[in-house]
Amino acid sequence: MLLILLSVALLALSSAQSLNEDVSQEESPSVISGKPEGRRPQGGNQPQRTPPPPGKPEGRPPQGGNQSQGPPPRPGKPEGPPPQGGNQSQGPPPRPGKPEGQPPQGGNQSQGPPPRPGKPEGPPPQGGNQSQGPPPRPGKPEGPPPQGGNQSQGPPPRPGKPEGPPPQGGNQSQGPPPHPGKPEGPPPQGGNQSQGPPPRPGKPEGPPPQGGNQSQGPPPRPGKPEGPPPQGGNKPQGPPPRPGKPEGPPPQGGNQSQGPPPRPGKPEGPPSQGGNKPQGPPPHPGKPQGPPPQEGNKPQRPPPPGRPQGPPPPGGNPQQPLPPPAGKPQGPPPPPQGGRPHRPPQGQPPQ
């Protein structure tokens, strides 16, 4: 559709310029008897069209100025868009049985491809320097809504494949939406604060998110000893242990780093903290978790499925080591270092 619109715009501009030079020397054709009435002759530098043959509907009325006229509609098909003023190009009329394409946009906008028939409507155009991902496929949950500012949106996931790292940009990174049949991804975020993942039903609830330079310890695991709580200050937090599966590297960027949430069927991971922190992607059941987004210009590869993943990437500030895997006793919790005191883990859902 984008290529068609661009080609039509170029053809309309070139034809309008060539017709404007020759119209003053040409005369409008006379009306043929037994055929519908043609358009009246026009004054000025306007292109003149021949009258339509019988059995077809009447074309659009003439326009003034340097305008390009689209072809008259065919019978049995919907009417094309009305004419426009100024040096504008006219798009082709829509085809029957297919949804209407997206309207043209102005400014520095990037529009995704229009949806195919039988599939949900694509996202609406946005203003500003935003980049919109492709529209979701049918039968899958809707991706997160667009965000304002210089934010980039991750592409929707494909079923049956591990999720790759979403794009980076700005002070905020949005995780990709979840797969079908799985819990909904995190809502959009505004400002320099990231939102914690939504609670899973039937599982212990994580403590609510916090603001400032506080670091929250992970909630207690049922039937397992409590891990050491994280320390406050400008230190990234290690991801929580997952029983029987290796942990991927945590994200980087900002003053604090949030570990990815656990997969379904496992206890809830630690909530997010305030500040310039990226949000990890939601969990995918039975599939390896891709690395969460990173800040800055650091490329990251998704981990291969079924293989243990390497140590977390180094950041500017000191990192906390990974807690021991589940099922093994853990040592005493270290005291909090610097910053504000951390909040003890809670098991009640956030109010």
UniProtKB/Swiss-Prot annotation:
Q: What name appears for this protein in its UniProt entry? A: Basic salivary proline-rich protein 3
Q: Which organism is it from?
A: Homo sapiens (Human)
As stated in the Swiss-Prot or TrEMBL entry, residues carrying the post-translational modification Pyrrolidone carboxylic acid are 17
Q: How is it modified after translation?
A: N- and O-glycosylated; contains about 50% carbohydrate. This is composed of highly fucosylated N-linked saccharides, the major structure is a biantennary asialosaccharide containing 2 fucose residues on one antenna and an unsubstituted terminal lactosamine sequence on the other. The Gram-negative bacterium F.nucleatum binds to carbohydrates containing unsubstituted GalBeta1,4GlcNAc residues. N-glycosylation on Asn-87 is prevalent in head and neck cancer patients.
Supply the Pfam families for this chain: Pro-rich
Q: Does the keyword Secreted apply?
A: yes
Name where it's found.
Answer: Secreted
The region called Disordered is annotated at 17-351
Matching entries from SMART domains are given as:
Pro-rich (SM01412)
Q: What does this protein do?
A: Acts as a receptor for the Gram-negative bacterium F.nucleatum.
| Any one cellular-component term (Gene Ontology) | extracellular region
Keyword Hydrolase belongs to the record? no
* Biased composition annotated in UniProt, kind: Low complexity: 99-111
Give residue spans, biased composition: Polar residues: 20-31
